[in-house]
Amino acid sequence: MSTGFFGDIQKVKYEGPDSTNPLAFRHYQPDEIVMGKRMEDHLRFAVAYWHTFTWPGGDPFGGQTFLRPWFEDTMKAAKLKADVAFEFFSLLGSPYYCFHDADVRPEGKTFAENTKNLNEIVDYFAEKQAATGTKLLWGTANLFSHRRYMSGAATNPDPDVFAFAAATVKTCIDATQKLGGENYVLWGGREGYETLLNTDIGRELDQLGRFLNLVVEYKHKIGYKGTILIEPKPQEPTKHQYDYDVATVYGFLKKHGLENEVKLNIEQGHAILAGHSFEHELALANALGIFGSIDMNRNDYQSGWDTDQFPNNVPEMALAYYHVLAGGGFKTGGTNFDSKLRRQSLDPADLLIGHIGGMDCCARGLKAAAKMIEDKALSQPLADRYAGWESAEAQKLFRGEYSLDEITHYVESHDVNPQPRSGKQELLENVVNRYV
């Protein structure tokens, strides 16, 4: 049954690249076969509950611009928001959604009230999922908005805050499991510091390690089959966050023996904030065996902060999905649109238009990436570049069968004098442009 929020808008359909209908897909066809697999199953799109239905449109210099009928902190409003959300998922044809606990339930005065409210809305979501076929990609706990978390959650100097946060995560894992969520995400928005003058880094990192171990232990205790994901971000809201980037998180996981238990949810905008390209973070996560899922958005390259805009750069998407496909594709992860409307985009249709554009952009990127893989457009030049390491002697060198003295003797006795070879960067950049 329609809520009426979207007026007479009908389910979004594919109309082809020549369509000028803003409420139609031009490139995204769920059933199109790409590399032997349905496009929908490659991309595994999800809608972010928080930016799409909870964000009021504020910024540091101005307050709310969106006037949504569910913007009240009551269970009645929470259920109306759920009605609109699941109608939106159906109109868009998104197979998945994601949420924080605070996005979906009213804020209670106590932990017990929060748990009661979450359980009630989870039961409501379960009915909605059954009726629409929409699934939960991942759930998570908001451990950053409430004032109790102003000094962190897991890294807070107050052990009672640590305990409250841990108990909250338990309820959110339970909710995620009940709804069939395929992943559970941890994002440390306040797990960092503003100044070292009042911060014991060593203690806070140890607290964070204990917290993450508790999560993994509980996952196994209850038999949750989903993947635990960490989402890196270098700063904002804190000056420096401990989950800075892929490399930093990997070192943290290794220290605590969790590199085989936890994978990463990598956001394009966060990669940019860390001074990396999106494809760098994806390639590194693949190389380290910790790639899990992605949050798809973009930042304004001039502003210097996290603007969470919908993706619109096909070459960037092509390179991103190239690394996703090259690593074997998503297992339990997917493409979550952690993107929000601009605060002047007031119309309900704008919510659909933003997602449609993002989905079309990702579809174009996926198809370009798949074609590059099928043609070995990048993999063959890469293999040629490193071909010298395939020789028997080079393999022994790589496996550590020669000492430094033996290597030196080889260089001297064979008069080794290697000459540099072209890296062909311009050629490869031109190759990519042929596909996009």
From Swiss-Prot:
The keyword Transmembrane appears for this protein: no
Co-factor binding comment: Binds 2 magnesium ions per subunit.
Name of this protein: Xylose isomerase
Family of this protein: Belongs to the xylose isomerase family.
Gene giving rise to this polypeptide: xylA
Cofactor(s) for this UniProt protein: Mg(2+)
Single GO MF annotation: xylose isomerase activity
NCBIfam families according to UniProt: PRK05474.1, xylose_isom_A
EC number(s) stated in the UniProt entry for this protein: 5.3.1.5
Sections of the chain in a coiled coil: none
Enzyme class: isomerase
